[in-house]
Amino acid sequence: MRLEKDKTGIARHRQWRGLKDTLYDYGQWLKLWGILIKWALRHPVLNVRAVFRYRWMLSYLTVPSFFDRLTGRMGGEGLRACRMNLNTVADVVTKDLEKTLVADEHLRPGNPNSKKIIYMDELIPKLVTAGFSDHVTILAQAIPAYLPSLINQHSPVHYIEASESYGLPADVCPLPSLEAGIAIEDDFPKVGCCFISCNMPCDGSIMTTTMQDRRFNLPTFPLNIPLRWTREDTQEYAVEEMKACIAFIEEQTGEKCDWDKLKEACERVNEQSRLKMEKWELNRTDTPPFIGGSSWIYRIFSYEFGCANPRVLANDRKVNAILRKPFEEGRAPYPYPKEVRHRAVVWNTPANMYAHFNAWIAECWGVQVVCDMIDLQGTQIIDTSTRESMLYGLAKMVQGSTMRVHTKGGWEVIMNDLWAKVEEYRADLIVMFDQISCKGVAALKGAFEEQARERGIRMVWVEQDLMDPTTISRRTMRDQVNQYMQTVMGETPLDADLVDFDDSEAW
């Protein structure tokens, strides 16, 4: 019998992982509740008003269930790394949410705190504004759009339908459609002295920025990022854009960029990047210690939200020490899944509405995801020796942003990098997400299949619609994998209870 009830996905009881791991997991679960309760009690009246003002606020009430789904049946080092990362996310995000609501002019009209905030597109890492310590940077779409779409699969549906009712085509990528819907419904917090937009990750996001810009009604700087970002002849332009962005922020805030503080922040980011690359190196071994959806979710968070954050860096150091320990002691990490049949590379953008897909495919079919495309971003080491070299490194980091690091830049980053990762991680299976609303990658489907055949690599296609569970459900995604594993691979599941179930009403 599955731990979760059909349809709702509510757990019948907590996952049993053995005495030691169960107690640890329960302790971290209580720690999460402590973070959430502490956040709620700091501004109880304001938070209640926010729940009634913003539809997306309700999704944050389900965070404990979301974290439980991501941990799956993990134990040992993987469980500890997962829980530590997730609680770090909760700690940092609740602080940003508090700063946002305290400054929100929708909740407190004429709020003077609003002008102390730099509003910025979620695809731009906070490192860009690290030299402006008198102001707070808030990633505009992250709190009302991106994070709720991970936490609760139903959260985006209302806003996507609002966009379509307004006249946007139904085949638009759900990411810009969701953001446009939030703007139409006026559900973005009203904060900021200025707004930094960008042309990432795709053309759809550029178009939805125009709708957001109308709603924000703030002085706006469009930070334009070269599409051919791997070419050296585009870097002069990228650096000039970065300089212009910093000058714009100085003009709007009245604060001069502190280059010494920016340098310190860049050096912290460099250490974070080195620690991330160490995790990749551990995953290339025969016994990768850390897999699951929490890996790529934490990477997106640490690149955008948590870059240069001392709290995040301290967590990275602790997590890496835990993951290194079994190798230093000459033993294998905790076995997850219980039987490893395949080492897989996941390519293309994963489905937000099924963030724990990696846990399911591991526990049902023994597929160990050792490399996620969405995890491979922003690890450019920044040369801090001069201001110019620092700006160059900062520009390169921004260009290697979430999703677009592989979906923009040409054949070499979307196609050649895939085969390089298959070789590096010694993968025998590719899980290829077919994001049906993404027109760019869809054009390469035949090329992917042809090159996989030439190399003798198995490839399972999994159709999904990113943030819209009404188009392709979690169950439909699982069915595609089930059919492939049973008919093409001729395999039987590790756990038959996980093959087919209904979680249509689950968060």
Where are these regions (language model features)?
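A charged, amphipathic alpha-helical module
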Residues: T8, W16, K20-I117, K243, ...
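An N-terminal, globular interaction/scaffold subdomain
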Residues: L86-F188
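Gly/Ser/Thr-rich loops at beta-strand to alpha-helix junctions
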Residues: I118-L127, C198-S205, W347-Y354, I436-A443
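Redox- and metal-dependent alpha/beta enzyme cores, enriched for Fe-S-associated oxidoreductases
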Residues: E122-E161, V345-W419, E423
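Active-site and donor-binding regions of nucleotide-sugar-utilizing enzymes
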Residues: P144-Q235, W461-E463
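A short, acidic, amphipathic alpha-helical segment used as a generic capping/interface helix at domain edges
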Residues: A180-D186, G409-R426, A443-A447
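Proline-aspartate-enriched helix->loop->beta-strand connector
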Residues: G192, V422, R426-M432
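C-terminal regions of proteins
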Residues: H406, E449, R453, M459-E505
